[in-house]
């Protein structure tokens, strides 16, 4: 049986592990192949995320940056990576990942796209 693929896109590895760990484990329990995208990380947090059994993907994103060209570059990078994986679902959280990952997922025709702005 071919498992479905889900991409979870956030910013920091520590945030992904701390706040999305249960969600990741739930997806894995339902036989999803989970790809975790992070833009800020240390080797310690990368190892913790890998230990969950996910495929870890890093990408460039300036969380506080105001350069539209850099953000456009991040969007194109996400488009390329999402196109390679061909997921069934993209779930993003935090402001910039929701904006740019949603555009990238729509551009690559991902069937199910979800974005969650934290704190709302």
Predicted regions, residues:
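N-terminal strand-loop element at the rim of the active site
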Residues: 3, 8-70
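Active-site proximal beta-strand in glycosyltransferases
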Residues: 5-7, 106-120
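Nucleotide-sugar donor phosphate/pyrophosphate-binding loop at the beta->alpha transition
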Residues: 18-19, 69-76, 111-112, 120
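Helix C-cap/helix->beta junction micro-motif
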Residues: 30, 52, 85, 108-109
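An amphipathic, basic-hydrophobic alpha-helix
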Residues: 60-89, 99-107
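Short His-centered aromatic/hydrophobic patch
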Residues: 92-98, 117
């Amino acid at each position: 049986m071919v498992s479905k693929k889900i991409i979870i896109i956030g910013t920091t590895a520590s945030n992904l592990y701390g706040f999305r760990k249960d969600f990741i484990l739930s997806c894995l329990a339902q036989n999803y192949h989970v790809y975790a995208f992070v833009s800020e990380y240390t080797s310690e947090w990368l190892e913790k995320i890998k230990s969950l059994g996910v495929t870890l993907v890093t990408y460039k994103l300036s969380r506080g940056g105001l350069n539209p060209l850099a953000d456009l570059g991040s969007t194109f990078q996400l488009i390329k990576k999402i196109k390679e994986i061909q997921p069934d679902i993209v779930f993003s959280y935090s402001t910039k990942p929701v904006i740019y990952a949603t555009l990238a997922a729509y551009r690559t025709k991902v069937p199910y796209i979800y974005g969650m702005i934290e704190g709302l």
